[in-house]
Design a protein with these regions (language model features):
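Conserved "landmark" site that anchors the functional core of diverse proteins
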Residues: 1-219
Length: 219
């Protein structure tokens, strides 16, 4: 990330990148307008958010709150790894999978599919078979849960996932790795690493500290 101070008439061009999925643009003291759930973003499918839930149009003015100058700061952190290691906890249905299936899940690379969207990240790789019927009793889902579908491919639940699901859940991505996961583009390679709950909790505490430090530098 990098900070900029803009004066009247200045223009800032924001270019796209093929190294990550999302980019973030932050204004000191934030935007004016309606905030829903502490956000002024727009969800056009649900028709909620600022701008009456409608998509912002080209050349439409967006107003910001009065702010002061910001100290210049720059930090570059690229995703250059050929394989992204994502840490997970064992899922609620972990026992539904054979030892062979578990070994396949943790020993092999998976590729992010082009079919990935905000509901789920679909992965392609060696098939994972379970010991029960593919469709089990539906259970509640949370962000980061990894289900194994009927074709044996894992799918990771993302921000717009459904509330319940009936596929076996082999694992769940730990909270401190979730943001990094969602920046992976189609074609990226993933390997999963199992961690215990206490380690995941400690990693999340470190993640919170790092995130707060970043926010304090750009506010």
């Amino acid at each position: 990330y990098q900070t900029f101070t803009l004066n009247d008439g200045d223009k800032l061009d924001i270019i796209s990148t093929n190294r990550s999925v999302y980019g973030y643009f932050s204004i000191k003291n934030g935007f004016t307008g309606e905030y829903i759930w502490e956000s002024c973003s727009v969800n056009t499918k649900a028709k909620i958010g600022s701008n009456n839930g409608e998509k912002y149009q080209s050349n439409q003015k967006i107003f910001i709150n009065k702010n002061e100058s910001l100290s210049e700061y720059k930090k570059i952190n690229h995703l250059n790894s050929k394989i992204e290691y994502i840490r997970v906890l064992k899922g609620t249905n972990f026992s539904f999978f054979s030892e062979k299936a578990k070994k396949i899940f943790f020993s092999n690379e998976f590729i992010v599919s082009k079919l990935t969207d905000r509901m789920g990240m679909r992965l392609e790789g060696p098939k994972i078979e379970n010991l029960v019927e593919t469709n089990i009793r539906s259970e509640g889902l949370i962000k980061g849960v990894i289900q194994v579908t009927a074709d044996g491919n894992p799918i990771i639940m993302l921000s717009d996932h459904g509330t319940i699901g009936g596929y076996p859940k082999i694992a769940v991505v730990i909270s401190s790795d979730y943001d990094r996961l969602t920046q992976l583009t189609p074609g990226s390679k993933i390997k999963f690493k199992s961690v215990e709950l206490d380690e995941a909790e400690n990693l999340y505490k470190l993640y919170e500290i790092e995130t707060k430090n970043i926010l304090n530098q750009i506010r």
